Amino acid sequence: MNFSAVILAAGKGTRMYSNKPKVLHTLAGKPMAKHVIDTCEGLGAQNIHLVYGHGGDQMKAELGEERVQWVLQAEQLGTGHAVNQAAPEFADDEKVLVLYGDVPLISAETVENLLDAQPTGGIALLTVVLDNPMGYGRIIRRNGPVIAIVEQKDATEEQKLIKEINTGVMVATGGDLKRWLAALKNENAQGEYYLTDIIAAAHDEGRAVEAVHPVSPIEVEGVNDRAQLARLERAYQAAQAQKLLEQGVMLRDPSRFDLRGTLQCGMDIEIDANVIIEGNVTLGDNVIIGAGCVLKDCEIDDNTVIRPYSVIEGATVGEECTVGPFTRLRPGAELCNDAHVGNFVEVKNVRLGEGSKANHLTYLGDAEIGKRVNVGAGVITCNYDGANKFKTIIGDDVFVGSDSQLIAPVTVANGATVGAGSTVTKDVNENELYISRAKERRIANWQRPTKK
């Protein structure tokens, strides 16, 4: 579909009480403006013009300078003035869609309906009927067709009774839009150039104005404060949870589940309460995710159990594995099939071989660990000397006793045993027992020191 979009995002967001531009506050882990940009890109917008004012450098850094055409509105003189800043870039014959960076839930389906509804030479306008329309511009109709929009502060008492309101989202042809914008005046209670005044201008020229309703009213709710943002967050999460339930995912408590990215699921998935999904996550068949887990940019294969309060980021977990509770898998962690990682174990940039176990109180970093290895409680791979990181290599069928330290770079060969409490500074040979302990001393009749 041949269209360009203008996203208005110049507001300061005073009621957010934040140094951050309002449209950079996140919904589902993503800036509000990015939701709108993604929707436009998904529909194939030819150009996306983002009108900004406050915090431009920060917005460009977070949203990406290359994704949109940045248009500065140095003074905030109204919505019509904002769109007019981008008007020189409009092609005369293209559809121009006006959206808002603080209205993040607008759906592709609603936008498509609006674009399709634009009459030739006219305007398609997104409206909604509210029980309490206070504060919104009212839709004025004459015998059915829309003829104007009147803002709350300019409305008569009779007009204030109208419940159909303007969402601000509209489509017009570029050439017409440029002409109407150039003719706007600021003779109103706000002293601003209202975009809504182009509706009356179109009507005066005999152009049709078509009103379209969104698929869901929540799509056109804007954000002016943190309470409204929290409301939209919950609405978004409820919708995501409902989709997953319909796809066969068992969410034990849909109201306590957050999807802040994308989730691909196999069959018979169970997800307990207070689980957060971030980035791109893939779950195989028969995966169980315990309560309070955070999964980010990871892949978990079939028949694996992630026990409660585990944090997994940038990791891959094989089939038939058990992780947690209270495990942290950091980027580069790879658990092969039937691996077990237990409570208070941290794994970073490690390949843990098939059938290997680290069940308690362990740090494994920058290591290659073979098959059927048992790593005892309190074991640490000492991978960092304060300046550089080094690798630990552990072969197959190795037993590393509790409270041992492996000082990298070091290799423990196949079948070796490291006795509990050892500090390993040199390579251990195959099938060798390595013990490194201080000499035991016993002092009979020992007298403890007393305070003086």
From Swiss-Prot:
Active site residues per record: H360
Pathway(s) served: Nucleotide-sugar biosynthesis; UDP-N-acetyl-alpha-D-glucosamine biosynthesis; N-acetyl-alpha-D-glucosamine 1-phosphate from alpha-D-glucosamine 6-phosphate (route II): step 2/2; Nucleotide-sugar biosynthesis; UDP-N-acetyl-alpha-D-glucosamine biosynthesis; UDP-N-acetyl-alpha-D-glucosamine from N-acetyl-alpha-D-glucosamine 1-phosphate: step 1/1; Bacterial outer membrane biogenesis; LPS lipid A biosynthesis
Cofactor annotation remark: Binds 1 Mg(2+) ion per subunit.
Region annotation Linker: where it falls in the sequence: 227-247
Spans annotated as N-acetyltransferase: 248-452
One Gene Ontology term, aspect cellular component: membrane
Subcellular location: Cytoplasm
Reactions that this protein is recorded to catalyse: alpha-D-glucosamine 1-phosphate + acetyl-CoA = N-acetyl-alpha-D-glucosamine 1-phosphate + CoA + H(+); N-acetyl-alpha-D-glucosamine 1-phosphate + UTP + H(+) = UDP-N-acetyl-alpha-D-glucosamine + diphosphate
Record function comment: Catalyzes the last two sequential reactions in the de novo biosynthetic pathway for UDP-N-acetylglucosamine (UDP-GlcNAc). The C-terminal domain catalyzes the transfer of acetyl group from acetyl coenzyme A to glucosamine-1-phosphate (GlcN-1-P) to produce N-acetylglucosamine-1-phosphate (GlcNAc-1-P), which is converted into UDP-GlcNAc by the transfer of uridine 5-monophosphate (from uridine 5-triphosphate), a reaction catalyzed by the N-terminal domain.
The protein's name in its UniProt record: Bifunctional protein GlmU
